[in-house]
Amino acid sequence: KVAEGDFDAAYEIITSTNSLPAVCGRVCPQEKQCESKCVRGIKGESVGIGRLERFVADYHMNKEVKDEIKVPESNGHRIAIVGSGPASLTCAGDLRKMGYDVTIFEAFHKSGGVLVYGIPQFRLPKEIVAAEIDNLKAMGVKIINNAIIGKSETVDELFEDGFEAVFIGSGAGLPQFLHIPGENLLGVYSANELLTRVNLMKAYRDDYDTPIKHFHNVCVVGAGNVAMDAARVSKRLGAEHVYIAYRRGKDELPARKEEVEHAEAEGIEFRLLNNPVAIHAGEDGHVTGIELQKQELGEPDEKGRRK
């Protein structure tokens, strides 16, 4: 339909199975998922599914007059969803398309979960997330913010209120630490905390109650997409040198190729085949350096990645 120029029909086809096309078109690893299975890739480049999806979603978003969103009449069954991240929003959209009455309970004051507090503005503009959520609301999905299920209300109370099923989409909120000396020093942040404070709470502002300190040298441990986000955010916060320390080589980087290229273009320095063993501090308890141990690649593990 895109090739035919019928972008409205293309949008209808995409949204029949995907409630977040503008988001997925920007941040999903299509090269490892749908595009990797494209038969056109056998003799050349795969169809740019992600970019086409993004184009169609943006075309629809920028239309002055939008078609009314078609949803079936309510079937009378109520579903509660805990959390408003991508899994919850997708679940809400799919259930609403099947006729269920859906209510999302979100602990934060803004909806979107990791799409809002985890992924930086330069990679996923917040107005894009807001527009996708507005589409769900137009379909009849209800969202209640500042509601912590387990404290504001329990799951049992949701059932007592008439909900027939509960989807738990609370996310993987706890960071994974390295368990090395110095993790509790001043100046050590989990990527989760850094990105949440910067993206959602605007802690880069000087008038913020507990502002993020501006550092000259930053080392990010790990090399997934979240690590790339943390490194690029640190650069934007004014860090002169930002390093990524990763225990494997470049071929083993878990981040999307596109994200690695962006990081390199922005001056992020990679310290590959280096594993952190300790974090050091001065007399004031503030970080002064990180100790790395040089690594060598071994045999592939059960997933095919070299150890």
Predicted regions located by residue number:
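A Rossmann-like FAD-binding core segment of flavoenzymes
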Residues: 127-177, 193, 199-209, 214, ...
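FAD-binding core/adjacent interface of flavoenzyme oxidoreductases
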Residues: 22-82, 98, 129, 141-217
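N-terminal Rossmann-like FAD-binding beta1-loop-alpha1 element of flavoenzymes
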Residues: 77-103, 227-235
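Short glycine-enriched, charge-decorated loop/helix-capping segments at active-site entrances
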Residues: 118-123
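Residue-level signal for short, function-critical loop segments
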Residues: 85, 224, 248
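Long amphipathic alpha-helical segments
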Residues: 1-25
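Glycine-rich FAD pyrophosphate-binding loop
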Residues: 100-116, 243-251
